[in-house]
């Protein structure tokens, strides 16, 4: 009789008296993929996402909010991993009273891009490539922080390196973007700023 024992994600066969099988068989068994990895892709790596528009973790200037010009911030990032075909960007506010509120959706940015300038237009089709989606204000492009009066809200900007060109329809929503890229994300980067009124 053999007894099956699972330990540390590897299958190990033991004799009834718990003597180990011959070394060659054990080596073969050790090649079994751990359970926590089976059916999953390797964890995505990180990209450093930077901005000159505000200090990460600090307060976002009014210029980038509904209280002033409401223009998009400048962004720059480091090289993505091999195989990157496009980039996507999502900005959201997880502290909104009604739940996470989406301020910016961008997708199919060319893989050669390493930055975006400040004050992009609100057009769906971006100059040089890429598209802007529909935010939770029901607008295309960027709509900056505009929280109700009170405590500061956090605004997360996330960049995704994507292994495909998504070819989503114009003005896609964050939900549609998430669903399209979920199994194609190769790396990601993140910034957070705060704003209060």
Predicted segments, located by residue:
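Bacterial N-terminal signal peptides
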Residues: 19-32
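N-terminus-centered regions that define maturation/targeting leaders and the start
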Residues: 35-197
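Residue-level recognition of conserved structural "scaffold" positions that shape functional pockets
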Residues: 14-16, 24, 64, 151
């Amino acid at each position: 009789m053999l007894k099956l024992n699972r330990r540390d994600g590897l299958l190990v066969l033991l004799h009834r008296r718990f003597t180990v099988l011959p070394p060659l068989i054990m080596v073969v068994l050790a090649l079994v993929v751990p359970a926590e990895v089976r059916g999953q892709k390797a964890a995505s790596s990180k990209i450093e996402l930077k901005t000159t528009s505000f200090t990460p973790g600090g307060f976002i200037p009014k210029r980038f909010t509904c209280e002033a010009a409401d223009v998009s911030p400048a962004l720059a990032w480091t090289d993505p991993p091999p195989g990157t075909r496009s980039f996507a960007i999502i900005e959201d506010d997880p502290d909104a009273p009604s739940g996470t509120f989406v301020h910016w959706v961008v997708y199919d940015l060319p893989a050669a891009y390493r930055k975006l300038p400040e004050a992009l237009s609100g057009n769906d089709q971006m100059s040089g490539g890429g598209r802007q989606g529909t935010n939770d204000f029901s607008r295309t492009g960027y709509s900056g922080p505009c929280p109700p009066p009170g405590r500061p809200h956090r605004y997360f900007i996330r960049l995704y390196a994507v292994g495909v060109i998504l070819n989503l329809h114009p003005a896609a929503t964050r939900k549609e973007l998430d669903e399209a890229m979920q199994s194609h994300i190769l790396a990601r980067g993140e910034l957070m700023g705060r704003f209060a009124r």
